[in-house]
């Protein structure tokens, strides 16, 4: 299995900290957030990592290089325009070379047993497994409805309040089979939550949900970043 970390976001809500660095380079626990992800993947046995870049694209490669000092091989994709999540991932089709991929949103911090997630994915046999958690404000996330076998029946990105039927939503870590690339067109920009997951369900592809029970935080604002920094030493194995 290979890994792709999506890191192209502008990080405008983290200004002024992101004036000179991408948001994945903001420090938590004395290290850039992205370093925590890379070290975790290396510990879990992942050696090939793809990273997409847009905002201040020189910063990440100048720090991580080819990844050798972290025990991995890093492959960079430099985007000339900012893309949605699925289109950003599509750029790694040749890198994946037919292998399964774990995909991580670079601005999340979480606790996760990757081997258990992959075992779950293998047992279910779907095209994709989406990590899930409960959200206080599900209207800001992609929410899901599942059956008793954890198969996803419905995925709704950022629903209106009257459309909310559950607070269980997307936690930003996926495992994809390589054939998922076939469902991401190149004619325009595509997002996983708004476009690809609903499309897969319409075409009767099996998506499964894996519930996270440990720590998870979306570091999208200065307030959440400060919380992550305070929480870091209170939890084990945060990445």
For every predicted segment, state its role.
Residues 113-139:
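Conserved donor-nucleotide/metal-binding helix-loop-beta segment in metal-dependent transferases, i.e.
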Residues 2-5, 27, 31-105, 109, ...:
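Conserved N-terminal catalytic core of the sugar/cofactor nucleotidyltransferase
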Residues 1-18, 25:
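N-proximal low-complexity "stem/linker" segments adjacent to membrane-targeting elements
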Residues 100-102, 109, 118-122, 136, ...:
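Catalytic-core segments of class I nucleotidyltransferases/pyrophosphorylases
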Residues 8, 54, 133-134:
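Histidine-centered beta-alpha loop that forms part of the nucleotide-sugar donor binding/catalytic region
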Residues 14, 60-64, 228:
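Hydrophobic packing residues within well-ordered alpha-helices of enzyme cores
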Residues 25, 143-146, 197, 209:
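A structural signal for short hydrophobic beta-strand segments in well-ordered beta-sheet cores
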């Amino acid at each position: 299995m290979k890994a792709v970390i999506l890191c192209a976001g502008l990080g405008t809500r983290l200004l002024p900290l992101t004036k000179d660095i991408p948001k994945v380079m903001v420090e938590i626990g004395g290290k850039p957030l992205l370093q925590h992800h890379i070290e975790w993947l290396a510990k879990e046995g992942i050696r090939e990592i793809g990273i997409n870049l847009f905002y201040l694209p020189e910063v990440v490669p100048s720090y991580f290089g080819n990844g050798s000092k972290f025990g991995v091989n890093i492959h960079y994709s430099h985007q000339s325009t900012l893309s949605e999540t699925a289109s950003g991932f599509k750029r790694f089709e040749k890198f994946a070379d037919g292998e399964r991929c774990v995909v991580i949103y670079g601005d999340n911090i979480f606790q996760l047993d990757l081997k258990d997630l992959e075992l779950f994915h293998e047992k279910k046999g779907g095209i994709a497994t989406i990590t899930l958690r409960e959200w206080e404000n599900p209207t800001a996330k992609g929410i899901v409805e599942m059956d008793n076998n954890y198969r996803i029946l419905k995925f709704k990105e950022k629903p209106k309040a009257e459309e909310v039927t559950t607070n269980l939503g997307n936690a930003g870590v996926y495992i994809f089979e390589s054939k998922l690339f076939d469902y991401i067109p190149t004619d325009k920009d595509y997002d996983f939550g708004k476009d690809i997951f609903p499309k897969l369900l319409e075409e009767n592809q099996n998506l499964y949900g894996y519930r996270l029970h440990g720590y998870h935080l979306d570091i999208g604002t200065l307030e959440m970043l400060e919380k992550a920094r305070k929480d870091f030493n209170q939890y084990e194995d945060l990445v």
